[in-house]
Amino acid sequence: MEPCEDKCKRGLSLNFFEEDGPSLRLNSDSLDFLARDFKVEGMSQDNFDQKTKLYITEESLQKEVNIFLTKIYIRESEREPPQSHNSVFQLLSKIRNSVPNVSAFRNNLSILSKELSFFSFARHIHNRRLCWAEFIYCIRRGIKAIFKTTVQFLPTRLAKIFEKKASEVLKDNLLQTCNSKREGEVCDVKEPAVASSESSDCFNDMQELNNIVDLRDYSNSRFQQNRLLDRNLKGWIQGESEKALKGRRTTKRNDKENYNYPDFSNDNELLFSLATLIVENNPKKENIIPKYYLRYLQRLSRTEINKEIIEIEKLELEVVQFQMSIANLINTQVEVTNTIEELGLRCRPLPNENE
């Protein structure tokens, strides 16, 4: 049996230094221990699948989510982002087949769909780094939520083993990724990860990785300054805002060379949406946006603001429709004849390889 750590260390790799934007690769093998280390005693694998398998196919689930992501991202992008989100549902498939409990999986899927809706405002933002950082954040939240809810359905002894393994994988494998400012290379973990990984080169970069991923932590001024707005965009916003305070119109693009900002399709749309993203996801709303930024936004015409509100309402409707599609998918395709409690079966972990 191949040790879990040999696969886990290849689980997640991030690179924020590629020319065409950050990349994410999530390998479902990193959680293969879920399907391998637990089994149902007294029942063959075939019967196990027939009796307790959740009939939500990867294809049907991916179809719904791909439609959602297409509406949010791809329709306004010049180039399609890498289809990394497919790996999320390979991951869900592993968890689905390993924990034979209908309620747990239904709850987990609902949680994941809510997490996906968090980055809906990224539709307006053509900053690829920000979009993909939000996407990674949602994946992390979804994985943590899945682990948290499935543990409570396991017997006490198994729950402790499961929780320990999940914690090790999350902390020391999935999140153990280099954010090296020297070359932007992903760490090559040579040995199986352990809880005390201070000696690892990756360990010192984990906090920086968390700052990149956790977009809701706007109280971190260093993150806000260095990650939320890149230097060019921040300089352009400040310059445009100062002009607005002097009574100059801000819709012209005659200062592009001076500020060297990215070529967005609609500057006002970007600014309004970026402000919305910040305000909606930060409890300290009165302190997060500089006064000159707010004054600039106030100078937008009522027509422009109304257009933005309409777009956001359409987007919220798409999120609701997506969540309803997932709910319908669960109701129509989850066919479980009996739960593990009704079958009266006992779970136990597989013996270790050395035993």
Curated annotation (Swiss-Prot):
Keyword set includes Iron: no
Any Gene Ontology CC annotation: cytoplasm
Location in or out of the cell: Cytoplasm
Coiled-coil ranges (or none): 298-338
Chief place of localization: cytoplasm
Keyword list, A-Z: Coiled coil, Cytoplasm, Meiosis
Keyword Cytoplasm carried by entry: yes
Any one GO biological process: lipid droplet localization to prospore membrane leading edge
Function statement: Has a role in meiosis.
Name of the featured protein: Meiotic coiled-coil protein 4
Phylogenetic placement of the source organism: Eukaryota, Fungi, Dikarya, Ascomycota, Taphrinomycotina
